[in-house]
Amino acid sequence: VVYVGLAALIYFQQSRFIFPAPQEVYAPAPGYQAVTLNTADGLALTAHWRAPEDGKPTLVHFHGNSGSLSGATSENRLFADQGYGVLLVEYRGYGGNPGKPSEEGFREDGRAALAFLKERAIAPKSIIIKGHSIGSGTAVNMALEQDAAALILVAPFTSTVDLVGQKIPIFPMGLIITEPFDNRAKLPQAAMPVLVQHGTADAVVPISHGRALAADGPTTEFQSFAGKEHDLTFDPEVQTAQARWLAELGL
């Protein structure tokens, strides 16, 4: 009875631990402006945007759990300083946005972000897709729909089923988790160059997830960072490594 009760608790409460959505609303940082992303299912989502300087690519960023537009600004400070276009996506149900978080909902949010860039005549081959943690799931989903220039995954998981199953191994998570974000099954289908970064001290998503994703991807480079934890995405060293990798691709 206790086992069944705990399984039911995980099933019915999973949105709370998969999507711990902060509600703080942040003003755009200098150089950014607030814009609206209109989703196909009728939501108007606030995002932050800075246009690219002439000849520079544009990066679309999907932040991690408990993240925000303010944090995403810090995660991409180096790119903004170098003149890249940057679109910081805020999900449905996060940061004062309407809607309820879900994998399919986040997919629609990502599509709205790419549509926003298309409206501004930004070519797919000038777009870099980037995701941290839970944002890696939407980044991978978008990489399968957009022929972008590159994909960057920071502290990604193979799937939420794998991740939660590692932390609570006594339950059949494949039957319980309804938001799988199955990066491992999808990433090999991505046609663009892929960079996976992970910290060796990540206690939230173990580095084994990043290694597994990199091993499965035909065009994937893996970078490990000794002693860095799950929030390595804010680290200037990590951002510099991203920029160096992009420069090698001519981006």
Residue ranges of model-derived segments:
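Conserved alpha/beta-hydrolase "acid-adjacent" motif
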Residues: A203-H209
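Alpha/beta-hydrolase fold nucleophile elbow
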Residues: A121-S133
